[in-house]
Amino acid sequence: MRLVLFLNMGGAMNLQDCEVFLKNMFNDPYILGIKNRFLRKFVAWIITKARVKAMQENYKKMGGKSPLNELTQSLCDKLNLKQDEFKFDFVNLYVPPFATEILQKYTLNENDEIILFPLYPHHSCTTVTSSLEILQDEISKQKIQAKVKTIDIFYKNKLYNEMIVSHILAKKNKFDAKILIFSAHSLPQSIIDKGDLYEKHVKDHVEILKEKLKDHFDEFILAYQSKLGPVKWLEPNTSDVLANLNDKALIYPISFCIDCSETIFELGMEYKHLAKCDYDLISCPNDSDEFAQFILKYLSDLN
């Protein structure tokens, strides 16, 4: 068996999951950065209690759940129907399904292979490194003898970028904007200052896409969303960019592969009240045929 596991932070499937998500996320040493495990757990508890009600209210506006799990499951189902060389499944870091239960579903031996595929096109210790460490620890804990391969960044991949360009232009045909905003999930500047490659990868990716789209837009803007707390984060903020727009725009969520609360609620709903001009949101790759095609080609090229 060649088991491909997509890795993501996960999205709450109900309002009760919001507390689970926050508690696990802020207890991740790559997120909070407090080395002492007991102190980190205590601080995570305080932050969770302070934020959970607001998160639940946001989720109510999305129908009470994130679309991330269902879209990822749909992507796995589509890929499993298209071929029989790989078996596709997914693991979340902060809400179910967790690594323990997913790995226990399969009987694996030394002739099998596990391919860990974080659904993040750009590298960050807060996403890719954290995901891979948790999975590799669980594989070791369960004494699984299968060979393990890992996928890292894929933002430079030609097929992946052709898909993005296609999705952007398809939306532009329906909403003719001259400004394209690339919105990436922000990170604290302190993480970047320690050598995290995320900002560099995102900027490189924007340059690749600008070159492919230069004949279709007059202006390209890279902005960062989802800032949290009083510390310095990557700038400019997407909300500030929208508040100062002088013409309508399209937004592409460049750091996301699957739609989640940050895209559906934050970009699609919350920022609408802040925007000076009208804008439209382009969906993530999600379970599209083009994304499935990219994944299969990418995996076949690994061999």
From Swiss-Prot:
SUPFAM superfamilies reported in the protein's UniProt record: Chelatase (SSF53800)
Sorted UniProt keywords: Cytoplasm, Heme biosynthesis, Iron, Lyase, Metal-binding, Porphyrin biosynthesis
Enzyme Commission (EC) number: 4.98.1.1
GO CC, any one term: cytoplasm
Compartments (UniProt record): Cytoplasm
Amino-acid positions noted as binding Fe cation in the UniProt annotation, renumbered to this chain: H185, E262
Pfam family, one: Ferrochelatase
Biological-process GO terms, alphabetical: heme biosynthetic process
Enzyme class: lyase
Reaction catalysis annotation: heme b + 2 H(+) = protoporphyrin IX + Fe(2+)
Gene Ontology molecular functions: ferrochelatase activity; metal ion binding
Pathway: Porphyrin-containing compound metabolism; protoheme biosynthesis; protoheme from protoporphyrin-IX: step 1/1
PROSITE patterns: FERROCHELATASE
Protein family membership: Belongs to the ferrochelatase family.
Task performed by this protein: Catalyzes the ferrous insertion into protoporphyrin IX.
Annotated NCBIfam families: hemH
Name this protein carries in UniProt: Ferrochelatase
Organism (species): Campylobacter jejuni subsp. doylei (strain ATCC BAA-1458 / RM4099 / 269.97)
Lineage: Bacteria, Pseudomonadati, Campylobacterota, Epsilonproteobacteria, Campylobacterales
